[in-house]
Amino acid sequence: MTWLLDVSALVAHLVQSHEHHSRVNAWWPGRTLAVCPITELGFLRVACALGSTMEDARTVLAEFLRDEAPTFIPCDRHALDSPSITSPRKTTDIYLADLATARGWHLATLDEGIAHPAADLIPELPVPP
């Protein structure tokens, strides 16, 4: 199975100070992962909003792409090809889930609010006793 990462999952993996960094990294090993232009651009936007320079954010993304070699897929579907988009809320998330579905994949996310059969919520870390 291949998982297309949404922006939240990619940011949590690449930003060590992110509150869900450990959660995503516990789920990550051994999985086949993919990114697309939307998730890459989203990472750059969020990393800069968190205080990174664009140059540093681009370097982090480039190192990830080089070292972890996720599958890259183009955004080759028109928005109108995503029948699951029925409201203005979550349009990008649903588009990404439909993009993954078109390839027989799932969308890896930290967002509990994505109502799509292909959206897989990355599980919480177990709480120690």
Which residues make up each language-model segment?
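A structural signal for short, well-ordered beta-strand segments and their strand-loop junctions
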Residues: 4, 34-37, 72, 107-109
